[in-house]
């Protein structure tokens, strides 16, 4: 566990495309009998000092078996980057403030502890401000680790009208190429061979896949 790190879990997704699960919110969707929120928070809690969940205003959240701190989006529907900004603003009030923040969307039920540890290690390297996985040629900012002192850059990017995490990463890399450390699939496979950590759930078909994987894991397959 890194005492200088927190986790920020955006959990405001409405799950509109998840068929029968729609309306309950992604945090409450279940996989293998456990909610997505529980699966994600119980994993990241073992690697950081605090878990901060950023939820939609007025919405309810399922309980988690680990200690979490719940805050509400300051701008409902503004997207995950705004939620992450809110989480960072909340986190830096602590004394001393954290150095690193694990970003992990609540719809990644198979996030592996080894992936979190690898990203924390890479983000702690000199000169690095964001450890950003890349899978199949696509950056994966919703499971990444960034330096908390990126908050001013995030605020400026949002103020300019930016909302994309990938756009933010590109902006930071343009100004300081070595600040964004890409963690490629080969390196990620050393701690998560099937790369299931990056299997997100947006559709009923996605949910059916993760349910099958969860069942296979319970059987030891």
Question: Residues of each region from the PLM?
Answer:
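Long, charged alpha-helical interface segments
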Residues: 201-202
